[in-house]
Each structure stands twice: as C-alpha cells, then as structure tokens.
Amino acid sequence: MSDLRKTLASLSSAEDFLKFLNIEYDETVVHINRLHILKRFHDYLKREGNTDALDDRALQALYVKLLSQSYQDFVVSDAVSEKVFKVFHQAMGVSHVSLEKVAVSARKGR
C-alpha cells in the first residue's frame, strides 16, 4: 500500500479529507452535509472502478476531482434533493407500522 493510500485510509471525517486534499470549503455546508458528502464521494469512487493501477499523483488528482464534485453537489443542492442514502429513496407513505403491530408490541412489553 502506498503512503498516500495509507494516509487516506487514516482519514475519517469529511473535514479531514477536504483539508488533506487542500479543497477549500464552507464549514457550514460541511457541518450540515458531512455524511452525505462522504457517501457521495464513496459512490463516485465506486463508479471509477479499480484504482489500484494509479500512482499516487494520479490517485490524488482523482480524489481531489471526486471530493470537490461531492462537496459541490451539496453547495448547490441539499440532502433531500440529492437522495444519497437509501432512506431518501423510499416512497412516501410506503413505510408504516400498523396500529395492530403497535398494540401487539405493547402487550408483549417491547
């Protein structure tokens, strides 16, 4: 594993990635959307396919491009509109719990 890949593997927050890759960002946008930005970044990376053949310079350029795009997606839009997580893809009103199930659960003490 290259030094860049090791460093990237040690990063955990959106802010860590943005700072490491020298991408300017608005703290308010990141604070509200950090998980969405990272999920979108992951999705973009997944679409790229295998990046094992890339050297550190090419890999860093790819990460900067994809993370910048992920961040910009939430500068110009919002989490509900972008629908990054599965919960946003569920149809309105489809997920529900019947009163009967609530009553049964209450009787069982759950």
From Swiss-Prot:
Keyword Oxidoreductase found: no
GO terms of biological process kind: nitrogen fixation
Keyword Nucleus belongs to the record: no
Pfam families linked: NifW (PF03206)
InterPro entries in UniProt: NifW
UniProt KW keywords: Nitrogen fixation
HAMAP family for the chain: NifW
Subunit structure as annotated in this protein's UniProt entry: Homotrimer; associates with NifD.
Function as written in the Swiss-Prot or TrEMBL entry: May protect the nitrogenase Fe-Mo protein from oxidative damage.
Family: Belongs to the NifW family.
Entry protein name: Nitrogenase-stabilizing/protective protein NifW
